[in-house]
Amino acid sequence: MTTLARNKKATHDYEIIETFEAGISLLGTEVKSSKAGKINFKDSFCKIEKGELILYNVHISPYSGASIFNHDPERPRKLLLHKKEIRRLQSKVQQEGLTMIPLEIYTNNKGLIKVKIALAKGLKKYDKREKIAEKEYERRIRKQQKYENI
């Protein structure tokens, strides 16, 4: 499994509740660009429309080797999941007020490009501060234990 791109802000801005693996429908030039790692996740999200899961705001840079037959970098991309999983996701999003965000794009052992999506809950500003303070406290404890063991 090779990670092509990771959404670094996702764990900072959201509380991850559950993760899923989905296939993604890409054009040929998008596959080449994504395998080169030219993907940007900034402000990306997933939405269910007409029973299909769609990925928005993922920028895949145009492939330099393709002349005029390049893709639109910002186009919405269809994610491939079973209908049962899509219905389950839709019910959770509607009932619990969760959002779906992509966490990472990677290739599996067969060379297929997959997207790890998450059901997440947005964090408020005070939650983020609390999380940062908690991490800082844990870091201090680990540092202190390290020096005591020496």
From Swiss-Prot:
A GO cellular component term found in this entry reads: cytosol
Q: Which GO terms describe its biological process?
A: trans-translation
What is any Pfam family matched here?
SmpB
Where is the protein localized?
Cytoplasm
Keyword terms of this UniProt record: Cytoplasm, RNA-binding
Name the InterPro entries on file: SmpB (IPR023620), SsrA-bd_prot (IPR000037)
Q: Where does this chain mainly localize?
A: cytoplasm
Listed Gene3D superfamilies: 2.40.280.10
The record's GO molecular-function terms, alphabetically, read: RNA binding
**Domain of life the protein comes from:** Bacteria
Q: What family does the database annotate?
A: Belongs to the SmpB family.
Q: What does this protein do?
A: Required for rescue of stalled ribosomes mediated by trans-translation. Binds to transfer-messenger RNA (tmRNA), required for stable association of tmRNA with ribosomes. tmRNA and SmpB together mimic tRNA shape, replacing the anticodon stem-loop with SmpB. tmRNA is encoded by the ssrA gene; the 2 termini fold to resemble tRNA(Ala) and it encodes a 'tag peptide', a short internal open reading frame. During trans-translation Ala-aminoacylated tmRNA acts like a tRNA, entering the A-site of stalled ribosomes, displacing the stalled mRNA.
Question: Which NCBIfam families does the protein's record reference?
Answer: PRK05422.1, smpB
What's the protein called, per UniProt?
Answer: SsrA-binding protein
Protein's organism: Petrotoga mobilis (strain DSM 10674 / SJ95)
Q: What is the lineage of its organism?
A: Bacteria, Thermotogati, Thermotogota, Thermotogae, Petrotogales
